[in-house]
């Protein structure tokens, strides 16, 4: 029985090894695994429940009716599929088209691209005009070379970051603001991103194969990232916010450029009767381009525009319209520059009568000044009154349409006065510039108290009638002078009572005790020696008895 089980065990091990080896060989040789497949002939409209898509499959498979059955081999024979503007709402079933290379689904009502996620052979994908909003399902389709996502309601192009073989990309008519995920698409040759919300072209700076950029109707103001693109042939930039076209001056292959109808809005400046504004419009050489028209009777003397205004207005403006020449082409460059004006008001900062001021536009935040300092006080904030009033919040409170004064307010500080009597400490809390309360004069045997000083020895005596608390903690030290005779009223103090020869006088001792004379200090020595000898003899005697 035991041998039988051993044989079975060996057989199982052998089968497992063979299966494992087969799996390794299969995977190592790169055999393609189908994403999904049907196992038996099935009606087209069962596999593809959307009627419009089923009809497109019928045509692609060469069938006469959507109820006809197809096999997986039939589906594998479909390499391109078109369902243009037919009202497709779902692409369920497309996951079985394992050899699909080209897919056109323009102008439908598709919202979910999940069935596409494993169709890795697709090279051309046309999805424009669908309310997709999210295209994360195509993030892994690295074979795609042409992708059209025009008017698909997408805002995030992050799923496109890994499509490294992408050569042609349409992103027009979407609310896209950030194109940073495109920075790694180094094979990109054609990019169309018109009518979006793009303002920064920096992610394109390293796309050296880019030949065509269509970016009309955006919010682009800086085109300097395009200066590093040597193969750029065609650039469309009309209806943007571009004021300086000099970055394109040295682009040697540039033949087609559109730069008309730029709308430039400068940062607001304060209104002045005599307003001077620099001209921001620059041509290919970097030199200013003279205005074509100037509002409000303004004048131009390069590089500045000047207006003499009699009263406040919200803005002034000027237009430009001039042909500019690049290496291979001359094109019109036109637009309008608007200079917003802010009516200026004065915010005065008052620190105990000393004033500074800043000019601030109405409804703008006031920049908080450096907190003032005042000896003996703590700054509590800026208020709209000298005392009381409301504290100004520089994070939220905005300048009214009038001049204002803000007052620095302070609270007086309290400090600690420490009284030190030979290391024994007591304290008082005293407000700045107030008088200290004089403690009770301390006493010390044999000494006379002389006062409180600002040092342990020496120093300056504190005058409690006039000395005021400084802006800091202080320590005052009790100082004393030693008395010459600690008890001058006692005639017996320090009076000797002996006979004059070093011996005591019994009659003056007040008792019968005899005090030792000068030679009696060693009278205990004989007693000690006697006790020692007695103890030694006793010890010797005890040892002698034990021996016997």
UniProtKB/Swiss-Prot annotation:
UniProt propeptide residues: 519-548
LRR repeat start-end pairs: 93-105, 113-127, 135-149, 157-171, 179-193, 201-215, 223-236
InterPro entries according to UniProt: Cu-Rt/internalin_Ig-like, Ig_E-set, Inl_IR, InlB-like_B-rpt, Internalin_N, Leu-rich_rpt, Leu-rich_rpt_4, Leu-rich_rpt_typical-subtyp
Main localization category: secreted
Signal peptide (from-to): 1-30
Annotated stretches, region: Disordered: 480-518
Induction info: More prevalent in stationary than exponential phase (at protein level). Single gene transcripts are substantially decreased in a sigB mutant, induced in mouse gut. Induced as cells approach stationary phase and by growth at pH 5.5, at 45 degrees Celsius, in 7.5% NaCl and by oxidative stress (at protein level).
Classification via Pfam families: Flg_new, Internalin_N, LRR_4, LRR_adjacent
Effect of loss of the gene: Increased expression of InlA. No change in invasion or bacterial survival in host mamammalian cells including macrophages. Decreased bacterial counts in blood, spleen and liver of intravenously inoculated BALB/c and C57BL/6 mice. Increased production of host IL-6 in liver and spleen of intravenously infected BALB/c mice, but not in macrophage cell lines.
Residue spans of biased composition, Polar residues class: 504-516
Entry-linked SUPFAM superfamilies: E set domains, L domain-like
Superkingdom of source: Bacteria
Positions carrying Pentaglycyl murein peptidoglycan amidated alanine: 518
Low complexity bias locations: 483-498
Domain comment quoted from the record: The N-terminus (36-79) resembles a truncated EF hand, the LRR region (80-262) has a curved form while residues 263-343 form an Ig-like region.
NCBIfam families found in the cross-reference section: internalin_H (NF033188), List_Bact_rpt (TIGR02543), LPXTG_anchor (TIGR01167)
Main function: Contributes to systemic listeriosis in mice by decreasing host IL-6 cytokine production and thus evasion of the host immune response. Does not contribute to invasion of the host intestinal tissue.
Name of the molecule in the record: Internalin H
UniProt organism field: Listeria monocytogenes serovar 1/2a (strain ATCC BAA-679 / EGD-e)
């Amino acid at each position: 029985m035991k041998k039988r089980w051993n044989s079975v065990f060996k057989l199982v091990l052998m089968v497992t090894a063979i299966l494992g080896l087969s799996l390794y060989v299969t995977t190592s040789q790169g055999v393609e695994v189908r994403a999904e497949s049907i196992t038996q002939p099935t009606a087209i409209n069962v596999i593809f429940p959307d009627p419009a898509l089923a009809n497109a499959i019928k045509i692609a498979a060469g069938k006469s009716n959507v109820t006809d059955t197809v096999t997986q081999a039939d589906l594998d024979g479909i390499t391109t599929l078109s369902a243009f503007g037919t009202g497709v709402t779902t692409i369920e079933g497309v996951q079985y088209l394992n050899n699909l290379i080209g897919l056109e689904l323009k102008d439908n009502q598709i919202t979910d691209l999940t069935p596409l996620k494993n169709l890795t052979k697709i090279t051309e994908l046309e999805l424009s005009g669908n309310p997709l909003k999210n295209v994360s399902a195509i993030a892994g389709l690295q074979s795609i070379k042409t992708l059209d996502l025009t008017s698909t309601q997408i805002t995030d192009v992050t799923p496109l970051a890994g499509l490294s073989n992408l050569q042609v990309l349409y992103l027009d008519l979407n609310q896209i603001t950030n194109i940073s995920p495109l920075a790694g698409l180094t094979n990109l040759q054609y990019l169309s991103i018109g009518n979006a919300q793009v303002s920064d072209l920096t992610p394109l700076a390293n796309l050296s194969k880019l030949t065509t950029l269509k970016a009309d109707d955006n919010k682009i103001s800086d085109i300097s990232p395009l200066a590093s693109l040597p193969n750029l042939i065609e650039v469309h930039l009309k209806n943007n916010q571009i004021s300086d076209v000099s970055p394109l001056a040295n682009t040697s292959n540039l033949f087609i450029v559109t730069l008309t109808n730029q709308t430039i809005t400068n940062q607001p400046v304060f209104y002045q009767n005599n307003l001077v504004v620099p001209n921001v419009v620059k041509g290919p050489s970097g030199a200013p381009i003279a205005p074509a028209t100037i509002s409000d009777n303004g004048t131009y003397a390069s590089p500045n525009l000047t207006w003499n205004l009699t009263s406040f207005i919200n803005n002034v403006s000027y237009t430009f319209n001039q042909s500019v020449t690049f290496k291979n082409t001359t094109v019109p460059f036109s637009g309008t520059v608007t200079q917003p004006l802010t009516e200026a008001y004065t915010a005065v900062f008052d620190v105990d009568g000393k004033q500074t001021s800043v000019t601030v536009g109405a409804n703008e935040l006031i920049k908080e000044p450096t907190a003032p300092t005042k000896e003996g006080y703590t700054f509590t904030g800026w208020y709209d009154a000298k005392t009381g009033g409301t504290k100004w919040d520089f994070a939220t409170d905005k300048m009214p349409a009038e001049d204002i004064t803000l007052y620095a307010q302070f609270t007086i500080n309290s400090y600690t006065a420490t009284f030190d009597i030979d290391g024994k400490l007591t304290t008082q809390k005293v407000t700045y510039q107030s008088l200290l309360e004089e403690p009770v004069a301390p006493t010390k045997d044999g000494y006379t108290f002389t006062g409180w000083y600002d040092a342990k020895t020496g120093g300056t005596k504190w005058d409690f009638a006039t000395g005021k608390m400084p802006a800091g903690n202080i320590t005052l030290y009790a100082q004393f002078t030693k008395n010459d005779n600690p008890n001058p009223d006692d005639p017996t103090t320090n009076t000797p009572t002996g006979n004059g020869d070093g011996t005591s006088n019994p009659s003056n001792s007040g008792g019968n005790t005899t005090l030792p004379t000068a030679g009696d200090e060693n009278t205990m020595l004989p007693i000690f020696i006697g006790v020692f000898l007695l103890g030694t003899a006793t010890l010797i005697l005890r040892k002698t008895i034990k021996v016997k």
